[in-house]
Amino acid sequence: MAEDKISAAVLDRLYATVQARKGADPETSYTAKLFHRGTAKIAQKVGEEAVETVIEAVRGDKAAMASESADLLYHLMVLWADAGLEPAAVWEKLAQREGTSGIAEKNARKS
């Protein structure tokens, strides 16, 4: 599906941009500023954006939810880059779980 490819390409470009800004000047780059402030601050921002996304979902505001979801994905990618986690590792986990019942998959992780 063309939309899937566009979405994947956007995420790949976003992660590449995040990585490229890792060493940028924190005075001129918000991404660099997050890296400079450290993992705890990045994780806090991920949590804040997750809560804001959930609030918009409960409110039923799809446009605001899309905006907050974009913020959440951005901050999540900053957290991944900070931890040295490549998106491919996450995509691999998702692919492994594809077609598996959520309950069965969760039970398999417990063993």
Swiss-Prot record:
Entry GO CC: cytoplasm
GO-annotated biological processes? L-histidine biosynthetic process
Q: Which domain of life is it from?
A: Bacteria
Please give the SUPFAM superfamilies that the UniProt record associates with this protein. Answer: all-alpha NTP pyrophosphatases
Q: Where is the signal peptide?
A: none
Subcellular location(s): the record lists: Cytoplasm
Q: Kind of enzyme, top EC level?
A: hydrolase
Catalytic activity field: 1-(5-phospho-beta-D-ribosyl)-ATP + H2O = 1-(5-phospho-beta-D-ribosyl)-5'-AMP + diphosphate + H(+)
What pathway does this protein act in?
A: Amino-acid biosynthesis; L-histidine biosynthesis; L-histidine from 5-phospho-alpha-D-ribose 1-diphosphate: step 2/9
Enzyme Commission code(s) on record: 3.6.1.31
UniProt GO molecular function: ATP binding; phosphoribosyl-ATP diphosphatase activity
Q: Which UniProt keywords apply?
A: Amino-acid biosynthesis, ATP-binding, Cytoplasm, Histidine biosynthesis, Hydrolase, Nucleotide-binding
Can you tell me which family this protein belongs to? Belongs to the PRA-PH family.
Q: Which NCBIfam families does UniProt cross-reference here? A: histidine_hisI, PRK00400.1-3, PRK00400.1-5
Name the record gives this protein: Phosphoribosyl-ATP pyrophosphatase
The record lists the organism as Azospirillum brasilense
